[in-house]
Design a protein with these regions (language model features):
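Edge beta-strand at a domain terminus
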Residues: 44, 112-116, 126-159
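Short, hydrophobic/aromatic-rich segments at coil-to-beta transitions
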Residues: 13-16, 122-128
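Alpha-helical protein-protein interaction elements
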Residues: 81-83, 88, 123, 138, ...
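Surface-exposed helix/loop patches within compact recognition domains
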Residues: 7-117
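Compositionally biased, low-structure terminal segments
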Residues: 6-7, 76, 90, 132, ...
Length: 159
């Protein structure tokens, strides 16, 4: 994806990963159709060639600043996951779980904590995800394990 956080120092690159059910289309600038989709925005080393897959390791959701809602510079580094940007529903930024119907978000969870572990065996990827939403009083988990034997598709832009 690139330097969308405008760090201008080539310290890390941001990647957007979409995990979606079969009824969800990912060819436009926004998911279409019907089903569930998990958008994960995470940071990798600048030199990473994502056409070779996602680097193995454990990625951790990083907190946003309470006032600015931005991610502090010290958290913008490889191994981090951008938490969901609060109260943005037209184009949710950061990491979000959504249930869409006819391309419209009907249910959602803004991700505020948790981890994504990526295991690699050649081209095979196994992602183990355990995220927590932003509801501090009654938090909900978004959990999944996803495996794919072929390289993960990489798009030039959203999604």
């Amino acid at each position: 994806k690139g330097d969308s956080y405008y760090l201008q120092d080539e310290s890390c690159r941001v990647v957007e990963l979409y995990l979606a059910e079969d009824g969800v289309g990912l060819t436009d600038t926004w998911p279409t159709g019907d089903g569930r989709v998990l958008k994960v925005e995470f940071f990798v080393e600048w030199a990473t060639d994502v056409t070779q897959g996602i680097p193995a390791g454990t990625y951790k959701v990083v907190a946003r600043d309470e006032e600015s809602k931005g991610i502090p510079r010290e958290f913008l580094k490889p191994g981090g996951i951008a938490s969901g940007y609060p109260n943005v529903f037209t184009y949710p930024q950061g990491t979000w779980y959504e249930k869409i119907s006819n391309g419209t978000m009907k249910e959602y969870a803004r991700i505020d904590g948790g981890t994504m572990t990526v295991a690699r065996d050649g081209d095979k990827h196994t992602l183990t995800i355990d995220f927590i939403d932003c509801d501090k009083a009654h938090p909900h988990h978004v959990r999944t394990t996803y495996s794919q034997d072929t390289p993960i598709n990489v798009f030039g832009s959203h999604p």
